[in-house]
From Swiss-Prot:
The complex is composed of six subunits: RsxA, RsxB, RsxC, RsxD, RsxE and RsxG. This is Ion-translocating oxidoreductase complex subunit A. NCBIfam families: PRK05151.1, rnfA. The gene is rsxA. It comes from Salmonella arizonae (strain ATCC BAA-731 / CDC346-86 / RSK2980). Its main location: membrane.
Length: 193
């Protein structure tokens, strides 16, 4: 049980996919201008990342390894992610049309989010079993969502703040992301994996 807690805390805070591994920066910068959009994208990414992580582990363990097709791992994981994203898009469209309109083009772009593919590939490289794989995918998604919501809240405050002209827009956003990354470095001694 302690191993699972350490895996969760380590993935969310210490080895955050956005601030430490620099994966998923496109939606991190693109969807974080409004808090509602960031929360919706975080929820959608959490669902996709967790489900894609589980499906990728199952496909790798039950199909690719027994048939000696491990060279198709990346391609098959991309296909799995695309199917999961399409499923998520259909669910969001039916359950929350307003969120579907807010997310716009970013929902299909989860397919190309390198963090989702990175989680699936890292699960295999780290040798996780099924529960660890599911927890790792969920933890990475929670860390992604946490950072995205925090960043969106900060960007909303910066939008109404008196920022010097050269720093307005993406410049202050990148500085803020760097400061967030430094803040998350404070967790580096918390968990040793």
């Amino acid at each position: 049980m302690t191993d699972y807690l350490l895996l969760f805390v380590g993935t969310v805070l210490v080895n955050n996919f956005v601030l430490v591994k620099f994966l998923g920066l496109c939606p991190f910068m693109g969807v974080s201008k409004k808090l509602e959009t960031a929360m919706g994208m975080g929820l959608a990414t959490t669902f996709v990342m967790t489900l894609a992580s589980i499906c990728a582990w199952l496909i790798d363990t039950w199909i690719l390894i027994p048939l000696d097709l491990v060279y198709l791992r990346t391609l098959s994981f991309i296909l799995v992610i695309a199917v999961v994203v399409q499923f998520t898009e259909m669910v969001v469209r039916k359950t929350s049309p307003a969120l579907y309109r807010l997310l716009g083009i970013f929902l299909p772009l989860i397919t190309t989010n390198c963090a989702v593919l990175g989680v699936a590939l890292l699960n295999i490289n780290l040798g996780h079993h099924f529960l660890q794989s599911a927890l790792y995918g969920f933890s990475a998604a929670v860390g992604f969502s946490l950072v995205m919501v925090l960043f969106a809240a900060i960007r909303e405050r910066l939008a109404v703040a008196d920022v010097p002209a050269p720093f307005r827009g993406n410049a202050i956003a990148l500085i803020t992301a760097g400061l967030m990354s430094l803040a998350f470095m404070g967790f580096s001694g918390l968990v040793k994996l």
